Amino acid sequence: MASPCDPLGCDEFFRGGFARRKASSYRSRGLDRTAARMLAFLRERGIAGASVLEIGGGVGEIQLELLRAGAARAVNLELSPAYEAEAAGLVREAGFEGRVTRRLQDIAVDGDGVEPADVVVLHRVVCCYPDYERLLAAAAEHARGLLVFSYPSHSVLARMVLGAENLSFRMRRLRFRVFAHPPDRMLSVLREHGLRPTVVHRGMAWQVAGAER
């Protein structure tokens, strides 16, 4: 049974309409470019028969592509319940019932019952979480082989954009915030937990880092 968790405002921001748009976009266009780069990193290193843990996977599109590419099973941990109906629909359409488990749980606060996995994925998740060190440490501890995550650029322009977004959230009285955490420090957290990180892609908006044990 999933443990109770503080959604950190994610339940206010990521609601049913957002989930429906994400699922519709995936059905019509597939993975976004950043997610596709993450998938390529994992496929190049081999995922046949692998177990997958995705933290904050939303409607689960990356998990589905990993299963299509040969992964055995996937677990998704989420803070917002709004994704569940759309995610279940995508799983049914893909024919992967019984191979995907979804839970409402904050692994950084409570990792009880979360088994280590061969592959750990965090797509646009660390930017929504204030304590990146705790989150990435928990993710790394659960990665038996590979970990890949995406995060916003740390450029001045990117930080200004995120600052403007946070101002709008405050004006709308939303608890949700976004963060541009320092990339070097995030990679150091992975090293401290036995992973060898490498930057896979540096984009103007989004960057991707992968790591191996």
Regions found by a protein language model. Give the residues of each.
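Conserved class I S-adenosyl-L-methionine
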Residues: M1-R45
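A short SAM/SAH-binding and catalytic strip from SAM-dependent methyltransferases
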Residues: V119-D131
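Conserved Class I S-adenosyl-L-methionine
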Residues: L162-V178
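Conserved beta-strand signature within the Rossmann-like core of class I S-adenosyl-L-methionine
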Residues: R144-S153
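Short alpha-helix
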Residues: F176-G194
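Class I SAM-dependent methyltransferase "Motif I" SAM/SAH-binding loop
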Residues: G56-G58
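A short, conserved alpha-helix within the catalytic core of class I
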Residues: Y129-A139
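Class I SAM-dependent methyltransferase SAM/SAH-binding core
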Residues: E61, E65-R99, L104
